[in-house]
Amino acid sequence: MGFVLVPKSDFQIPLEADTIDPICLKGWDLDEIRSLQVYEGNIKRPLGEFFEIAETSHEDQLIRIDGDVSRVKYIGSGMKSGKIIINGDVGLQLGCEMKGGEIEVNGNVSSWIGMEMHGGTIKINGNAGDYVGCAYRGEWRGMKGGKIIIQGNAGNNIGGGMMAGEIYIGGDAGNFCGIRMNGGEITVRGDAGRAPGAEMVSGIIKIHGRISSLLPGFKEISTFKEDGSLMILFKGDLSEKNPEGNLYINYNKNLHILENETDEGRVITKKGIKVIYNSGSTIREGQIIKGGNKLTDDYIDECARCCISPEDYKLLGEPENVVVSSHGNEVVLRAVEDPGIQMGTIFIPRGIWANVLTPPYTESTGSPMYKGVPVYLRKASQGERILSAEELVEEYGVGK
């Protein structure tokens, strides 16, 4: 025997309803199901206070929800068997830690679906939010099995920390698809944002559309045809230890990335040249700030610098200082020609100057993502100088 749940009215306060699980309802009568407890805010209330609940003659362990439950969280959390069909939009953390069974949504879903799931199938016949199949905040191991199918578009950080399983996106994906991926497979039939596969060490990502930018830590390996499209395989992310990640992108839709630009073909606008900014902590930086002091001349010398490829350094006129600008902020940095930097990218040590340039929306499991940020780079004028850490804190409010 299955059950049908219909919301009695709009939800004024979000509900936490992990009790909506086929195995929890098996063998229960209607009165027992109506008395199951859910959280409205921090107050426990009976499920029957919010839903009309009726029996249905459909298959056993089937729950059908008819209506908008976009403010209901944790539906199918930890689910092991059975099926849930939702005809409407759904809230956060659908099917998190799911181990088996099937969830199908005829609508859109919010973020964090399939968090750390181990098995089962989630099918979304609409769009999904951010962090699909991702890890919890503070954790690094995401989805460990199962399958997530999204027929529409999905947001940022898809498959973050993914260990195993499959994610299929029929539309577009946002930024950092497959970030810190350790296994499994992600397929995106449409376009994707910037930096797919950032910090991945294993697994497969296939993007059949256009990507905004490719991190320099990916090495081109081979070209082949798949489903009539010419695809290129990249290995990476080479910024990680012993990486075995496989990133496939569509050749014809990514000529802006694949065709090597020459000095003659690059244009310097009023803002400068467009490059990809990456950041990371350095050994010397760690030695300097041991003890917490970031206000020394040594700290400025190490962190207020911009490493530039020889080609871009020459294109800019071999400057002493450069201005790097991003999302309305800009910093002046000492220019350093570095043969180890790929043309079209720059490296800035992770410090207060880098924080000014790193947009907050690049977050990944709680921290901003200091890789793959599009910025502009130009030669500094005579009156533009490098600001101290104190001056940057005063001007931009970035933390020490």
Swiss-Prot record:
Source organism superkingdom: Archaea
InterPro entries, sorted: Asp_de-COase-like_dom_sf (IPR009010), FmdC/FwdD_MopB-bd (IPR041717), Formylmethanofuran_DH_csu/dsu (IPR012048), Formylmethanofuran_DH_suC (IPR017550), Glu_synth_asu_C_sf (IPR036485), MoPterin_dinucl-bd_dom (IPR006657)
Keywords of the record: Methanogenesis, Oxidoreductase, Repeat
EC number: 1.2.7.12
Region (7 X 13 AA repeats of [GW]-X-X-M-X-X-G-X-I-X-[IV]-X-G): 76-209
Upregulating conditions: By growth on molybdenum, under anaerobic conditions.
The keyword Nucleus is annotated on this UniProt entry: no
Any Pfam family the entry gives: Molydop_binding
UniProt key word Coiled coil: no
Disulfide bonds: none
Extent of the Sequence repeats: 76-88, 95-107, 114-126, 140-152, 159-171, 178-190, 197-209
Alphabetized GO MF terms: formylmethanofuran dehydrogenase activity; molybdenum ion binding; molybdopterin cofactor binding
GO biological process: methanogenesis, from carbon dioxide
Pathway in which the depicted protein is active: One-carbon metabolism; methanogenesis from CO(2); 5,10-methenyl-5,6,7,8-tetrahydromethanopterin from CO(2): step 1/3
Reaction(s) this enzyme catalyzes, per UniProt: N-formylmethanofuran + 2 oxidized [2Fe-2S]-[ferredoxin] + H2O = methanofuran + 2 reduced [2Fe-2S]-[ferredoxin] + CO2 + H(+)
Subunit description: Consists of five subunits; FmdA, FmdB, FmdC, FmdD, and FmdE.
Entry function: Catalyzes the reversible oxidation of CO(2) and methanofuran (MFR) to N-formylmethanofuran (CHO-MFR). Can only oxidize formylmethanofuran. This enzyme is oxygen-labile.
PANTHER family in the record: TUNGSTEN FORMYLMETHANOFURAN DEHYDROGENASE, SUBUNIT C (FWDC) (PTHR39673), TUNGSTEN-CONTAINING FORMYLMETHANOFURAN DEHYDROGENASE 2 SUBUNIT C (PTHR39673:SF5)
Family the UniProt entry places it in: In the N-terminal section; belongs to the FwdC/FmdC family. In the C-terminal section; belongs to the molybdenum dinucleotide binding protein family.
Protein name as catalogued: Molybdenum-containing formylmethanofuran dehydrogenase 1 subunit C
Gene name linked to the record: fmdC
